[in-house]
């Protein structure tokens, strides 16, 4: 019998994966198939390209303007040509924006670095199944569209267009896409949005996403820190309210557990394909999770929040005290069928960096 167990395990493993291909962590099941359509790539930013798609002439560069139906398969941005981590590195003052099928407001609007799981641009490398960073930024989210797509880099920091700005922005980009004859009716459009808020979580939950319509949630990255203290709690619950629920049908009991860890985040960083953690800023943590096999479908609406559980009265009381205010930021990724709710208004560039460390003086002190 003991000799049959390995064979039985191998058979079951093979049978399961034949029915459940893991596209994000293995080769696509149709890699050998020569499909119709063609693969194309659009370049921008580098000196060989027209000046209209370089930061020397504009602060809003259209890095790709595509006709459909098609699907974006990869987007790459090179590091700035004069990147100096001491004097300047990419931060939240440059945004990635993507518009589908002629829409006037974007479906993707995030600080570039946060989109790539590099909040505030403080990482030297990130390694996940769907985005990575190492001397460049790459994303592999499939992004289908029917009529047209426009991919932009928008700089809204203090510098004007010109050579100085060009020297500190990504110096090269390409967008790879594959042309298609048509898209199935249930194909969603890729969306991503960024939020940041400081709040008393004992009194109010942090809202990472609130949207109406039909779609599925496929991932997020989150940062948390306390501007007053060198610690932050991980006892918050992550709640997914689907289709108007008053009690979330998907609720993870513990911030670290929802990202695949337990008993607090680990003492050292861990970057796995679908989940990961690393230190953030001076006294915080950052984590990411991609929902590949466990994407959260919704048909009418979805609200995603971070807050304490209903019975956690002690935590709620403790984190209603001003010294325990928490700062959260998040980038969420989802697919949406049809029009989506407007994305939250982007904060001014000067307000996107993590809030500075602050001293807290209790009321009543004589100074």
Question: What kind of region is each of these model predictions?
Answer:
Residues 6-19:
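Bacterial N-terminal signal peptides
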Residues 1-4:
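Positively charged n-region of N-terminal signal peptides that target proteins for export
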Residues 23-367:
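Beta-strand-centric surfaces of beta-sandwich/beta-rich domains
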